[in-house]
A protein has these predicted regions:
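Conserved small/polar residues in nucleotide/adenosyl-binding loops
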Residues: 225-232
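Pan-zinc metallopeptidase signature
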Residues: 109-223
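Surface-exposed beta-strand edges and flanking loops
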Residues: 23-25, 209, 226
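Accessible peptide chain termini
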Residues: 1, 223-224
Length: 233
């Protein structure tokens, strides 16, 4: 039995159903909760422990993520649902704890999340920091206000909890962006120059608003759950 066949069998055993497991040249793993298809990427340098992590994660969606339409932003739902299903998989299959820990460690060592050269992780969007934190980076910092949402993500029990928190987080992120834009839109007096001083050229001062990340509200059903894509597969 090949390694691919072993991982496919493992996925079916964990999910307790005859899932369709496909191995494709794709950037990351995913699970289609509607068609019950688990897709695993074909990566050249990934270890068996990383594949155990991917299988454990996507089977978590197979077991615990319902096949229903949602009215919350998909990106936010995905992050929070990942937290919930991984916690539940570790509770259901304690032996997977080591696979998750060592698998994420390997992914971080390979800069899977693409933030190795980010000077300050505190500057990236809040929802991304939540994702990185729960995927093995406990050095991520949160403000006391943000920590309330992080703790809430850790306590989600049902998919309904996930939806509600995703909407709250989305609104929180929007409020922060709106406040930032209002701050950038404040009229700043033009600098005054003494025209009597010779040899001094008038320098134009530009104030550019900080570009905000686009939190898109997804209208489509939340059916396909994917793992983060690596830089190099």
């Amino acid at each position: 039995m090949t390694n691919s066949e072993v991982k496919g069998t493992l996925a079916r055993l964990l999910a307790t159903e005859n899932l369709t497991v496909e191995h494709r040249k794709v950037s990351t793993a995913s699970f289609d909760v509607n068609n019950r298809v688990l897709i695993l990427p074909i990566w050249k340098n990934a270890s068996s422990i990383v594949y155990d992590l991917l299988v454990g994660h996507e089977v978590g969606h197979a077991l615990y993520t319902p096949n229903i339409p949602v009215d919350a932003p998909k990106a936010f739902v995905n992050v929070i649902e990942d937290v919930r299903i991984e916690r539940m998989m570790k509770q259901t299959y304690p032996g997977l704890k080591k696979s998750f820990f060592e698998g994420y460690k390997e992914l971080w060592d390979q800069d899977f999340f693409g933030v190795k050269y980010t000077d300050n992780l505190d500057t990236i969007p809040f929802i991304d920091r939540i994702n990185l934190y729960f995927k093995g980076n406990n050095t991520i910092n949160f403000t006391p206000e943000e920590q309330v949402y992080v703790d809430a993500a850790e306590r989600t029990k049902s998919f309904d909890d996930v939806e509600k928190l995703a909407i709250e987080l989305y609104q929180y992120a929007q409020d922060k962006e709106d406040a930032k834009e209002e701050s950038n839109d404040v009229d700043v007096p033009s600098p005054k120059f003494d025209q009597s001083q010779s040899g001094d050229s008038e320098e134009e001062v530009q104030f550019e608003p900080t570009s905000s990340d686009d939190y898109e509200d997804q209208d489509q059903d939340c059916l396909l759950y994917t793992s983060p894509s690596p830089r190099d597969s």
